[in-house]
Amino acid sequence: MKYELVSTDGRARRGRLIFERGVVETPAFMPVGTYGTVKGMTPEEVAQTGAQILLGNTFHLWLRPGQEIMKLHGDLHDFMQWPGPILTDSGGFQVFSLGAMRKIKEEGVYFRNPINGSPVFLSPEKSMEIQYDLGSDIVMIFDECTPYPADWDYAKRSMEMSLRWAKRSRQRFDELGNQNALFGIIQGSVYEDLRDVSLKGLVEIGFDGYAVGGLAVGEPKEDMHRILEHVCPMIPQDKPRYLMGVGKPEDLVEGVRRGIDMFDCVMPTRNARNGHLFVTGGVVKIRNAQYKEDTTALDPECDCYTCRNYSRAYLHHLDRCNEILGARLNTIHNLRYYQRLMAALRQAIEEGKLERFAADFYGRRGRTVPPLGAADAAS
């Protein structure tokens, strides 16, 4: 993988990730394909929304169908018939989500398989081996996603263990002869000094890109913005920056304004299945009665298949009847909305008009633009 920085506007960056499997224009949003599928979508449909890279879930694909089934097909690209690049998370966040079902030790994490209750062990080395078999174009190191809230002492211990696991991940990745990209994950909760130590340690190890982890786990938005404003300028300029598990459309805009290149989140697909649809002016909750006789397009400014062909009333009808087609049409739209948003952000950066774009984006929602930190505003 190669990263090219094309242009900047303040802290925001317009670039591209170049893989053997294709080019990803950044800032980019990655739809989440947890089990080797973006729920309800064929790979062709996902590509038609404008997505150039997907996220797969190491933890879930390891438990089901497993490495051996994957290898029978070749790798995850062959298994799910997605020809473009794939990033896989390491399993750290899923282990974090298990709560009391897991025990974190220096050697790795012991937990019960959520499918059948059998004992399972996942380590940095095992995560690298699984992702190698998946053929991931971007491999994530195995880390502990520090919970929120966490006091400074706990966050320090967690961050230091993640650094040790980062070294082990790097070593096993290299031993396997993996020629794809390996990203480090910056931890440290909401504490700037711990984030500094984490980033310094990761840069010393050396990675192809750097993710900001441990955010969007319950902390106030102000803390997320503060950490991004602090960390992003210190990440090597020639490496991509990835904000994990984020997020809402507003979060994408704010992440881009602060220098983030890559995002992922289940929100567009999960919300679509629940009738929560993103449109130019905000959100449409399509199951609400006000849309029963609404013959207009879901979003007149959207060019997706759903908006070009169906009315709000029809989508309301499908939702009320729990028809599978409703979930699919909603998903097509939400994914396209996110990709259109990213394309607009890229264009705004190229034209040096990102702050004007942000003002329009929030103005359509009846809101004001959140302030940047002093350093970001000055840049």
Curated annotation (Swiss-Prot):
<feature type="region of interest" description="RNA binding">
    <location>
        <begin position="245"/>
        <end position="251"/>
    </location>
</feature>
<dbReference type="GO" id="GO:0005829">
    <property type="term" value="C:cytosol"/>
</dbReference>
<feature type="active site" description="Nucleophile">
    <location>
        <position position="264"/>
    </location>
</feature>
<dbReference type="GO" id="GO:0101030">
    <property type="term" value="P:tRNA-guanine transglycosylation"/>
</dbReference>
<feature type="binding site">
    <location>
        <begin position="89"/>
        <end position="93"/>
    </location>
    <ligand>
        <name>substrate</name>
    </ligand>
</feature>
<feature type="region of interest" description="RNA binding; important for wobble base 34 recognition">
    <location>
        <begin position="269"/>
        <end position="273"/>
    </location>
</feature>
<dbReference type="InterPro" id="IPR036511">
    <property type="entry name" value="TGT-like_sf"/>
</dbReference>
<feature type="binding site">
    <location>
        <position position="214"/>
    </location>
    <ligand>
        <name>substrate</name>
    </ligand>
</feature>
<feature type="binding site">
    <location>
        <position position="143"/>
    </location>
    <ligand>
        <name>substrate</name>
    </ligand>
</feature>
<protein>
    <recommendedName>
        <fullName>Queuine tRNA-ribosyltransferase</fullName>
        <ecNumber>2.4.2.29</ecNumber>
    </recommendedName>
</protein>
<dbReference type="GO" id="GO:0002099">
    <property type="term" value="P:tRNA wobble guanine modification"/>
</dbReference>
<keyword id="KW-0819">tRNA processing</keyword>
<keyword id="KW-0808">Transferase</keyword>
<feature type="binding site">
    <location>
        <position position="333"/>
    </location>
    <ligand>
        <name>Zn(2+)</name>
    </ligand>
</feature>
<feature type="binding site">
    <location>
        <position position="304"/>
    </location>
    <ligand>
        <name>Zn(2+)</name>
    </ligand>
</feature>
<keyword id="KW-0862">Zinc</keyword>
<feature type="binding site">
    <location>
        <position position="307"/>
    </location>
    <ligand>
        <name>Zn(2+)</name>
    </ligand>
</feature>
<keyword id="KW-0671">Queuosine biosynthesis</keyword>
<dbReference type="Pfam" id="PF01702">
    <property type="entry name" value="TGT"/>
</dbReference>
<dbReference type="InterPro" id="IPR004803">
    <property type="entry name" value="TGT"/>
</dbReference>
<dbReference type="InterPro" id="IPR050076">
    <property type="entry name" value="ArchSynthase1/Queuine_TRR"/>
</dbReference>
<comment type="subunit">
    <text>Homodimer. Within each dimer, one monomer is responsible for RNA recognition and catalysis, while the other monomer binds to the replacement base PreQ1.</text>
</comment>
<feature type="active site" description="Proton acceptor">
    <location>
        <position position="89"/>
    </location>
</feature>
<keyword id="KW-0328">Glycosyltransferase</keyword>
<keyword id="KW-0479">Metal-binding</keyword>
<dbReference type="InterPro" id="IPR002616">
    <property type="entry name" value="tRNA_ribo_trans-like"/>
</dbReference>
<dbReference type="GO" id="GO:0008616">
    <property type="term" value="P:queuosine biosynthetic process"/>
</dbReference>
<feature type="binding site">
    <location>
        <position position="187"/>
    </location>
    <ligand>
        <name>substrate</name>
    </ligand>
</feature>
<comment type="similarity">
    <text>Belongs to the queuine tRNA-ribosyltransferase family.</text>
</comment>
<dbReference type="GO" id="GO:0008479">
    <property type="term" value="F:tRNA-guanosine(34) queuine transglycosylase activity"/>
</dbReference>
<feature type="binding site">
    <location>
        <position position="302"/>
    </location>
    <ligand>
        <name>Zn(2+)</name>
    </ligand>
</feature>
<dbReference type="GO" id="GO:0046872">
    <property type="term" value="F:metal ion binding"/>
</dbReference>
<comment type="function">
    <text>Catalyzes the base-exchange of a guanine (G) residue with the queuine precursor 7-aminomethyl-7-deazaguanine (PreQ1) at position 34 (anticodon wobble position) in tRNAs with GU(N) anticodons (tRNA-Asp, -Asn, -His and -Tyr). Catalysis occurs through a double-displacement mechanism. The nucleophile active site attacks the C1' of nucleotide 34 to detach the guanine base from the RNA, forming a covalent enzyme-RNA intermediate. The proton acceptor active site deprotonates the incoming PreQ1, allowing a nucleophilic attack on the C1' of the ribose to form the product.</text>
</comment>
<comment type="pathway">
    <text>tRNA modification; tRNA-queuosine biosynthesis.</text>
</comment>
